[in-house]
């Protein structure tokens, strides 16, 4: 009977876990994974135990890479995979459990600083780039040789940007090359002036110049991807780039270009809709999407204070990687806010999979902080550290007696007038939400209780005295997929 709706119960016990196999030939492992640089990193530190972190798509090469590194360094290598959160973040907790003295991160990385001090080396990969095709595509997209343009790329193509700029500089006068914001070695020389760090990249701007003056040419992506909105790195750039500047992308294999202006407008419209949903929300779920990135506890406290100031109830949920099945267990929550790294916040979310919107911390800030600039003037910040005190983008909450809290606000989704929030500090004895009524009754104002009262099913009821007393009988045996009394039909 169970085969009609699902696979037999024995299939889970007989299933064999497949292996991804060796994806890269042995002759190319040294070049693709920069083994010579990794060996120098391990020898300079004198580490005896090193953790090697691989994403799922590169686990097929993990065994061969670890064997080559052990042979070259004499150190013990530990392979880390299946991270609790995003694979782009450094798995500091996994490295500590293995007793590793250093960590080497392979594959795409958000380059967020870890929460605990640990020597880390990043190997972003070296994807082949058709320089001649990309140069022709750049010339077709940028006919004006005097227009300022910055070269961007996905992390695995960053090694080819300087060579591409060499082909273009004889004609283009104002060309800027970005580079990944890798951590600088201890004791290294800091250039003066220091380059601007944004979007996980460094921009060597000349004195008096700003990044908002430049257009962008992005090298990365693949034509095999049917939905380009699933690239979190490119989405981060499109959301944070100046709206009035041109932005185009180029496939490194074929040189095919695409104007990203329409896609950028669609992403911004989606984010503005999420901000409106957050303003209408009464209950906010704060998802702990990382435990290994620096200042995540401070950011969590900041978001809780933000929701309290806006008159909303917040709950902190630690669920690992968020999935629709996990979040469906909390129907009382109106919106969720994912506190994660920039790439984790913009991770692929198939349309319609989550029954409640999942927001970024920046969108909750725009919804709850009345001092935040209006849309079009405020930058879209993809890293939660940009919202904290000490950042140039930090906007403090206005005082409780500020007129900004009493400004009329109308929902663009429902058309209703939103009431101003009731600000009460956490140490106020009158913040227990118990309000005396003229009829000498007490009413408790709770969004969760209001939601429970509106539900048709409120859980199992004891029904004391309403059912006859009977003896205990034997219940059904088996599992839900196949009980013993259902037979084999």
Swiss-Prot record:
The keyword Phosphoprotein applies. Pfam families: Diphthamide_syn. GO terms for cellular component: 2-(3-amino-3-carboxypropyl)histidine synthase complex. [4Fe-4S] cluster binds at residues 89, 110, 341. GO terms for biological process: protein histidyl modification to diphthamide. Pathway: Protein modification; peptidyl-diphthamide biosynthesis. The modification Phosphoserine is found at residues 7, 446, 456. GO terms for molecular function: 2-(3-amino-3-carboxypropyl)histidine synthase activity; 4 iron, 4 sulfur cluster binding; metal ion binding. The modification Phosphothreonine is found at residues 435, 467. Binds 1 [4Fe-4S] cluster per subunit. The cluster facilitates the reduction of the catalytic iron-sulfur cluster in the DPH1 subunit. Component of the 2-(3-amino-3-carboxypropyl)histidine synthase complex composed of DPH1, DPH2, DPH3 and a NADH-dependent reductase. Interacts with DPH1. PANTHER family: 2-(3-AMINO-3-CARBOXYPROPYL)HISTIDINE SYNTHASE SUBUNIT 2, DIPHTHAMIDE BIOSYNTHESIS PROTEIN. Required for the first step of diphthamide biosynthesis, a post-translational modification of histidine which occurs in elongation factor 2. DPH1 and DPH2 transfer a 3-amino-3-carboxypropyl (ACP) group from S-adenosyl-L-methionine (SAM) to a histidine residue, the reaction is assisted by a reduction system comprising DPH3 and a NADH-dependent reductase. Facilitates the reduction of the catalytic iron-sulfur cluster found in the DPH1 subunit. This is 2-(3-amino-3-carboxypropyl)histidine synthase subunit 2. It comes from Bos taurus (Bovine). The lineage of its organism: Eukaryota, Metazoa, Chordata, Craniata, Vertebrata. The gene is DPH2.
């Amino acid at each position: 009977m169970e085969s009609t709706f699902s696979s037999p119960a024995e299939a889970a016990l007989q299933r064999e876990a497949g292996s991804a196999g060796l994806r890269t030939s042995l002759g190319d492992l040294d070049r693709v994974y920069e083994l010579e640089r990794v060996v120098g990193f391990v020898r300079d530190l004198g580490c005896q135990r090193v953790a090697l972190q691989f994403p799922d798509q590169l686990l097929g090469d993990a065994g061969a890479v670890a064997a080559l590194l052990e042979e070259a360094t004499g150190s013990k290598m530990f392979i880390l995979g299946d991270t609790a959160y995003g694979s782009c973040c450094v798995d500091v907790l996994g490295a500590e459990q293995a007793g590793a003295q250093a960590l080497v991160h392979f594959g795409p990385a958000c380059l967020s600083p870890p929460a605990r001090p640990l020597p880390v080396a990043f190997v972003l990969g070296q994807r082949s780039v058709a320089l001649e095709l990309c140069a022709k595509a750049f010339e077709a997209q940028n006919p004006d040789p005097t227009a300022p343009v910055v070269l961007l790329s996905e992390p695995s193509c960053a090694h080819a940007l300087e060579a591409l700029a060499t082909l273009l500089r004889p004609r283009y006068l104002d060309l800027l090359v970005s580079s990944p914001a890798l951590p600088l070695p201890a004791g290294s020389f800091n250039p003066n002036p220091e380059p601007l760090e944004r979007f996980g990249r460094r921009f060597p701007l000349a004195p008096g110049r700003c990044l908002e003056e430049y257009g962008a040419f992005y090298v990365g992506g693949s034509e095999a991807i049917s939905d380009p909105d699933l690239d979190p790195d490119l989405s981060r750039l499109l959301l944070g780039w100046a709206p009035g500047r041109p932005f185009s992308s180029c496939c490194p294999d074929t040189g095919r270009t695409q104007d990203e202006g329409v896609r950028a407008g669609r992403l911004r419209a989606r984010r503005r809709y999420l901000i409106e949903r957050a303003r209408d929300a009464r209950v906010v779920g704060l998802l702990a999407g990382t435990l290994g990135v620096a200042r995540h506890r401070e950011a969590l406290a900041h978001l809780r204070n933000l929701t309290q100031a806006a008159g909303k109830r917040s709950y902190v949920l630690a669920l690992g990687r968020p999935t629709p099945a996990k979040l469906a267990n909390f129907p009382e929550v109106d919106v969720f806010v994912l506190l994660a790294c920039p790439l984790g916040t913009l991770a692929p979310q198939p349309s319609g999979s989550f029954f409640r919107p999942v927001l970024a911390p920046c969108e909750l800030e725009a919804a709850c902080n009345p001092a935040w600039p209006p849309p079009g003037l405020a930058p879209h910040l993809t890293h939660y550290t940009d919202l904290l005190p000490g950042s140039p983008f930090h906007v403090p909450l206005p005082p409780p007696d500020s007129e900004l809290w009493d400004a009329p606000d109308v929902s663009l989704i429902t058309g209703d007038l939103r009431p101003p929030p009731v600000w009460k500090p956490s140490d106020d004895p009158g913040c227990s939400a118990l309000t005396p009524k003229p009829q000498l009754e007490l009413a408790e104002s709770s969004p969760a209780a209001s939601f429970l009262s509106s539900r048709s099913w409120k859980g199992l009821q004891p029904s004391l005295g309403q059912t006859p007393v009977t003896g205990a009988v034997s219940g059904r045996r088996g599992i839900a997929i196949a009980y013993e009394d259902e037979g084999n039909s």
